[in-house]
Amino acid sequence: MGGQKTHFGFSTVNEDEKAGKVAEVFHSVAKNYDIMNDVMSAGLHRVWKHFTINTAHLKKGDKVLDIAGGTGDLSRGWAKRVGKEGEVWLTDINSSMLTVGRDRLLNEGMILPVSLADAEKLPFPDNYFNLVSVAFGLRNMTHKDAALKEMYRVLKPGGTLLVLEFSKIYKPLEGAYDFYSFKLLPAMGRLIAKDAESYQYLAESIRMHPDQETLKQMMLDAGFDSVDYHNMSAGIVALHKGVKF
């Protein structure tokens, strides 16, 4: 696979280099990730995640896999939904992000299983989870098609995948959004996190991520049925939903 090329932001790199470069970004931003999310989105990321949690049809005792769960926002919500008899796994490929997420949950008295896991090679059995979620993580994966197939594999028949991700903003707002993404965002990263370069990558990675219809087709290709999406904040983010029958 070493000869294959892929995108790292706007740069073209070897596929076997991307994971390491993405890891460097998230090792760098982990400690400031939550405050930067609040600043960058003016708190809207909390609204997007709240909507995602309320979209899921979960009951007490269900099993949930939170992929690229980072600092644990969705895992916390899932745990409240499924109760003590349920099972929620917080996973991330980045040890720094996973440590921050685990510690945050522990500080809130919430003990959940955590796993340092690659979404393209999930360490879970077939047909195990009622719900799989991935928020703001799919765009950083090298082989998104492989990751989606793994998510399909670990879901029970009747289970649901929820993908919350930055997407294609409505066209009249593109100019203002570009100014924000490529001028203001790196400046905020420099000021708050002392790291403009990582936030430049984040802006670029959003632009390189598949748009709403393309991701919908990718989920269908991975085997999901009843795939649909809901735009939020004029398409800045979209929540995709697919079911395994």
UniProtKB/Swiss-Prot annotation:
It catalyses: a 2-demethylmenaquinol + S-adenosyl-L-methionine = a menaquinol + S-adenosyl-L-homocysteine + H(+); a 2-methoxy-6-(all-trans-polyprenyl)benzene-1,4-diol + S-adenosyl-L-methionine = a 5-methoxy-2-methyl-3-(all-trans-polyprenyl)benzene-1,4-diol + S-adenosyl-L-homocysteine + H(+). Methyltransferase required for the conversion of demethylmenaquinol (DMKH2) to menaquinol (MKH2) and the conversion of 2-polyprenyl-6-methoxy-1,4-benzoquinol (DDMQH2) to 2-polyprenyl-3-methyl-6-methoxy-1,4-benzoquinol (DMQH2). The keyword Methyltransferase applies. InterPro entries: SAM-dependent_MTases_sf, UbiE/COQ5_MeTrFase, UbiE/COQ5_MeTrFase_CS. One of its GO terms (biological process) is methylation. The gene is ubiE. Keywords: Menaquinone biosynthesis, Methyltransferase, S-adenosyl-L-methionine, Transferase, Ubiquinone biosynthesis. HAMAP family: MenG_UbiE_methyltr (MF_01813). It is an enzyme of class 2 (transferase). Its EC number is 2.1.1.163, 2.1.1.201. This is Ubiquinone/menaquinone biosynthesis C-methyltransferase UbiE. GO terms for molecular function: 2-methoxy-6-polyprenyl-1,4-benzoquinol methyltransferase activity; demethylmenaquinone methyltransferase activity. PROSITE patterns: SAM_MT_UBIE, UBIE_1, UBIE_2. The keyword Transferase applies. Pfam families: Ubie_methyltran (PF01209). Belongs to the class I-like SAM-binding methyltransferase superfamily. MenG/UbiE family. S-adenosyl-L-methionine binds at T71, D92, D118, A119. Pathway: Quinol/quinone metabolism; menaquinone biosynthesis; menaquinol from 1,4-dihydroxy-2-naphthoate: step 2/2; Cofactor biosynthesis; ubiquinone biosynthesis.
